[in-house]
Every structure is written in C-alpha cells, then in structure tokens.
C-alpha cells in the first residue's frame, strides 16, 4: 500500500511517521508514504506555486501547472491505479466505512491544499474524490491527510498489538464505542468512582451484553443519526430495538 502526499509542508508529516503504533507500518514499508514538496515543481526562481485569484478577493490560489507537474511525477513513479483525493470542506465526510475501503485498496494520492484553495481546473481534470474532516475550516489539507493515514494504517494486519482493538472501535459496527475502565477498581466513595460490577464478573456473555447496551445508549443520546443509519442497514437486532425502545433519553 502506498500513499503519495502532495504538500507545501512535508515537515508536518515527519514526526507522525516516526511515532506511535502506526510507526512500525511506515518504517517497514507495509504502508509506504512518499512526501512530495510542491515547490520543487515550480519553475520560476521564487518557487511560486500560487497567485492572485481572477475576479479579485483575498488570499491566493494554488496554480494548476506546478500541481500537474507534481502529479505527473507521482504517476510516473507509482502508476495510475491510486485515486487522487483532495481535502476540502466541500467534500464528503470522512467515515469509517470509507476508511475501510481505502484500507483494502492500493493507497491514494493525497492533495493538501493551502491558501484560498486550488484552481478549479486542476480539480476538474484530476481529482477523483473530495473528502472533508468536518464542518470547520483548517489552514490546509495536511491535518486531514494525517487523519486519513492514521485511520487507514491502523487497520492493516499486524499494526495494532491486539488485532481485536480496531474491531471494537467507534464506528466499527456503525455505533459509538462503549466506555472502558482499568485499574484501580475504585477511585473514591461515589458509585461513579467504581468500575461497573459486570466488568469484574468474568462472565463474557454479560460483559458483551453490557457493552452493547452502552453502545446503543451512548449512540442514541449523542448521535441518533447513526442509530437511524444502523437501522436502515439492518444492523440492529430485535434485542437492540427493544433496548432502544426502553431508553429514557
């Protein structure tokens, strides 16, 4: 799996590639990440990759020609199979479903915009997919690219110490995750300071039932849209529906 990142700030990626549980995948080449400095593809003495927008207005627009030279270099080295992904608030929301699809593919070319944006002609010619990290504005596409790299890499075989870890993540089954507890068993005298007794019981079926109940309760309270989506996908059992009907939210 290979990711080629087109960016004006490759140095933002270096610490990420050498830290955390995903580091093993990057350093071994299991997930190969190539960083491409867009200024290397500017042809003037000033390494200019942006200019003023036609029609006026604030800010600068990233130019088509340096981007196309960079993309040609990527395709010459990596081939044409990987989709070109542009990060923008206008894109489709990044979801765990899309992350899983990308994790099963060959990789992608990640385009990190800056300034007021990228000349639409480059987007129209070359971009295969646009993805948004959320309904807010960032200074560039580097943070969404880092988020996608992390999300995809942790799904690769052997990256996490426990292969079951990502199977219990939020969104792995369309719902939010349940609460987690560790030692000590009690932090204080209040009931909320104690680990729920069911988790100490050693009864696996009861633990699984409690976790599912918590997932449903938290998701219904905080993200009811995910409950609707799970229901539409047929992912809720009759027992799930009975529990949801009994909740006092």
Curated annotation (Swiss-Prot):
Annotated keywords: Cytoplasm, Methyltransferase, S-adenosyl-L-methionine, Transferase, tRNA processing
Keyword Cytoplasm: yes
GO biological process terms on file: tRNA N1-guanine methylation
Protein family per UniProt: Belongs to the RNA methyltransferase TrmD family.
Function description: Specifically methylates guanosine-37 in various tRNAs.
Protein name per the record: tRNA (guanine-N(1)-)-methyltransferase
Top-level class of the enzyme under EC nomenclature: transferase
UniProt binding sites for S-adenosyl-L-methionine: 113, 133-138
UniProt cross-references to InterPro entries, sorted A to Z: Alpha/beta_knot_MTases, tRNA_m1G_MeTrfase_C_sf, tRNA_m1G_MeTrfase_TrmD, tRNA_m1G_MTases_N, tRNA_MeTrfase_TRMD/TRM10
Subcellular location: Cytoplasm
GO cellular component, one term: cytosol
EC number of the protein: 2.1.1.228
First-listed, main subcellular location of the protein, grouped into a coarse class: cytoplasm
SUPFAM superfamilies associated with the record: alpha/beta knot
Pfam families membership: tRNA_m1G_MT
Domain of life: Bacteria
Record text on subunit structure and interactions: Homodimer.
Example GO molecular function: tRNA (guanine(37)-N1)-methyltransferase activity
Catalytic reaction annotation: guanosine(37) in tRNA + S-adenosyl-L-methionine = N(1)-methylguanosine(37) in tRNA + S-adenosyl-L-homocysteine + H(+)
Keyword Transferase: yes
